[in-house]
Amino acid sequence: MTDIAATAEMQAALLSRALPYMQRYEHKTVVVKYGGHAMGDIELGKAFARDIALLKQSGVNPIVVHGGGPQIGAMLTKMGIESKFEGGLRVTDQKTVEIVEMVLAGSINKEIVALINAEGEWAIGLCGKDGNMVFAEKARKTMIDPDSNIERVLDLGFVGEPVEVDRTLLDLLARSEMIPVLAPVAPGRDGHTYNINADTFAGAIAGACKASRLLFLTDVPGVLDKNKKLIDELTVAEAKALIKDGTVSGGMIPKVETCIEAIERGVEGVVILNGKTPHAVLLELFTEHGAGTLIVP
């Protein structure tokens, strides 16, 4: 057998094995939160766009939600605005929220749309303001003061939490064979614009759409056990236990908590996976073993 024939046979075998998984997700909604290192790598960005295009061509209804923290920080520095933090969280004043909206909804959003469109699909860039899709309220965050051990309220300015999601526009776009690319910016009923954590925003969107899967592309392979080995699958109860016993710690805690909240809103399964792996989305959805940690009810 020639090398060309062997390669063709291998590709055919891969497609054959992927078929049952393609059928499983046909006509289902999959929300993908795109962030981390992959957003800063041109080739990984192209591979991600190709994955999203292939999902659509396979009959899946993908929705992309993206972050952009490093890009926001870079723009603030460029404009001579000092980034302020409270308890490790960015404080977003009026001037900052205007820049956040410009970077997320204006710059990054359109770059992702262009990448997907270059793969032959029809993507459209939106944020929570469009079609009154998402309404937010000022986030209520607290922290324990390390000196006094007293809980205090953090004033993060125009940092919000999604409290209302209307899926009407998203359903319309799905029927129109379009791929929504969403920036985590939303209005409040008070007339202010709010910057929302992209993970939280993605969880709210996935919950409202009763998504089959919510994928979080991160810079880590997934949830690790005490021996630093990847855990393939967890139930919500098991995930809560890992947080309680300290196995899940640091920045992974809010990530796992967001996964749990999404499942409680009706998402069938949430996956934390490494976005630095080329075609991580396809590996997770269309292969037997997946590519990260799946959290299920």
From Swiss-Prot:
Database matches in HAMAP family: ArgB
Pathway stated in the Swiss-Prot or TrEMBL entry: Amino-acid biosynthesis; L-arginine biosynthesis; N(2)-acetyl-L-ornithine from L-glutamate: step 2/4
CDD domains: AAK_NAGK-C
EC identifiers of the protein: 2.7.2.8
Database matches in InterPro entries: AceGlu_kinase-like_sf (IPR036393), AcgluKinase_fam (IPR004662), ArgB (IPR037528), Asp/Glu/Uridylate_kinase (IPR001048), Glu/AcGlu_kinase (IPR001057), NAGK-C (IPR041727)
Protein family per UniProt: Belongs to the acetylglutamate kinase family. ArgB subfamily.
Main location: cytoplasm
Reactions mediated catalytically: N-acetyl-L-glutamate + ATP = N-acetyl-L-glutamyl 5-phosphate + ADP
Residues with site note (Transition state stabilizer): 33, 255
Subcellular location field: Cytoplasm
Annotated keywords: Amino-acid biosynthesis, Arginine biosynthesis, ATP-binding, Cytoplasm, Kinase, Nucleotide-binding, Transferase
Any Pfam family matching the protein: AA_kinase
Protein name as it appears in the record: Acetylglutamate kinase
A molecular function (GO) term: acetylglutamate kinase activity
Residues given in the record as substrate binding sites: 68-69, 90, 195
Any one cellular-component term (Gene Ontology): cytoplasm
GO terms, biological process: arginine biosynthetic process via ornithine; L-arginine biosynthetic process
Function: Catalyzes the ATP-dependent phosphorylation of N-acetyl-L-glutamate.
